[in-house]
Amino acid sequence: MSILARDRNIAVIGLGKTGLSCADYLTRRGYGFCVMDTRENPSGLAELNAINPDVPVVTGKLDQDMLARAAEIWLSPGVPLSHPDLQAVKGQVKICGDVDVFSREANAPILAITGSNGKSTVTTLVGEMAKACGVNVAVGGNLGTPVLDLLADEVELYVVELSSFQLETTDRLGALAATVLNLSEDHMDRYADMMAYHLAKLRVFYGCRRQVLNRDDALAQPPLSREAEITWFTLKTPEPGQYGVLEEKDGAWLAYGAEKLLPVEQMRIRGKHNWSNALAALALADAAGLEREPCLQALREFTGLTHRCEWVADKDGVAYINDSKATNVGATQAALAGLGPVTSGGIVLICGGQGKGQDFTPLAPAVKEWVSTLIIIGEDGPKLKEALAGGVMALSAETMEEAVKLAAEKSSPGDLVLLSPACASFDMFKNYEDRGDQFKQWVRAL
């Protein structure tokens, strides 16, 4: 921040959680700033007034003159860089995001996690591992607390989840270690193609000292770097120096090379995709120098996150799992591939919603292999049905109540009812949390 001239304002774009965090940060440090939001009446106006009642505010548009005169433009992740008013000043004024500012100000090492799926789980798990080792850790980013709110002198380690939107405006994160857990089609309503999404995700590695890479997902791997160390993780047998899975007579083990670390049956989070998440977390913890045994104990105790392959109930021999956070095809693929092999019966899958321009056909093989019945909801239900229903019974439901009741009717003891929509929720629900909460409500009412 010392590089900024105090006689020129920062232009903060967006009055959501990130913009309000930026406003609070600048106010506490005595910097002048203005705020703009393309919405006429953004919900954050009252909170901004409480933070700083004197700040200039423009709503309903971006003010071109104020943008051109700004020292920097701090852009919220919900506003695309392609906005015409931002393109008009690109090259004249530095455009960055809160993560870029955070990376300049953080005085402790950063572990950065991104990917299409699993990033909140891994971020939270690494945070729990650090706490188990007695480290003063700050955890946040895309999953909760904005990164600027994490900054504190006493913090010894930052563990942050980052979205592709946040990374678009991050020039050089400089993380101690970073990972792209996996990559599958998502946000195609924002990106021109999969390559643009891929390149945004790979920005997490800029200036990174150790890259934690998924050996099983070529899309999640950057070009090999001479500057960064590399640690690999895989669901296959690991090579020396890699994290992976050993299939032994007594079951599957998480392993580091030939060293067995933890039997997967001791983990409380379900599914093979969570084996991969656990391995990535262990690799990141290793990069931060955390002691292994407290990390393994934290892994044993970790129960997972709400709305992410969350166990809800067992009813009449049928397990009900809430994976409402699965808002893209890759997340639902991971849930099916992870839960299918450990389910004695079939899976009754509730899916659908707003597809965000995704191609649903990559989900078809997993549906064919593991799903006995499809219950389809939401505005892109017809597209899902067309892409997935070949050879599988497909039924439509107008509400979550109807979907849960249909799923209960079509399931038998040993089956698993899985809400894993592969879509956004806003056509029928307030958000994915509301969708998951309604699922749990109607399951418990059965």
Swiss-Prot record:
It is an enzyme of class 6 (ligase). ATP binds at G115, S116, N117, G118, K119, S120, T121. It is found in: Cytoplasm. Keywords: ATP-binding, Cell cycle, Cell division, Cell shape, Cell wall biogenesis/degradation, Cytoplasm, Ligase, Nucleotide-binding, Peptidoglycan synthesis. The keyword ATP-binding applies. InterPro entries: Mur-like_cat_sf (IPR036565), Mur_ligase_C (IPR004101), Mur_ligase_C_dom_sf (IPR036615), Mur_ligase_cen (IPR013221), MurD (IPR005762). Its EC number is 6.3.2.9. Belongs to the MurCDEF family. Cell wall formation. Catalyzes the addition of glutamate to the nucleotide precursor UDP-N-acetylmuramoyl-L-alanine (UMA). HAMAP family: MurD. This is UDP-N-acetylmuramoylalanine--D-glutamate ligase. The lineage of its organism: Bacteria, Pseudomonadati, Pseudomonadota, Gammaproteobacteria, Oceanospirillales. The gene is murD.
